[in-house]
């Protein structure tokens, strides 16, 4: 009888320990699953940001392209201003030459 009581007590202890192991395992698995879900959420968020950054990259590329065009236009305007100055000097010389001919 004592053997049965001891065996029963041991079985209770084993059952209690097994329940604790099951609880800790379930809690650990649950925590792991929650953490995994959170990490996937963070990953999706970061991936969406990267996609938005591609839009920013496209915007920067467009601005650089437009800046290049603007620089080219500024050079052309400067060349036209220089050409206009040369024409102005040429016309002034023609006017001076005509005045001299008229005065002679």
Swiss-Prot record:
Coiled coil spans: 56-99
Keyword Transport carried by entry: yes
Which Pfam families does this chain map to? BLI1
Instruction: Give the highest taxon in the source lineage.
Output: Eukaryota
One Gene Ontology cellular component annotation held by this UniProt entry: endosome
Q: Which InterPro entries match?
A: BLI1
Which keywords does UniProt give here? Coiled coil, Endosome, Transport
Q: What is its subcellular localisation?
A: Endosome
Name the family the entry cites: Belongs to the BLI1 family.
Q: State how it assembles.
A: Component of the biogenesis of lysosome-related organelles complex-1 (BLOC-1).
Report the function annotation for this chain.
Component of the biogenesis of lysosome-related organelles complex-1 (BLOC-1) involved in endosomal cargo sorting.
Q: What is this protein called?
A: Biogenesis of lysosome-related organelles complex 1 subunit BLI1
Source organism phylogeny: Eukaryota, Fungi, Dikarya, Ascomycota, Saccharomycotina
- The gene name on file is BLI1
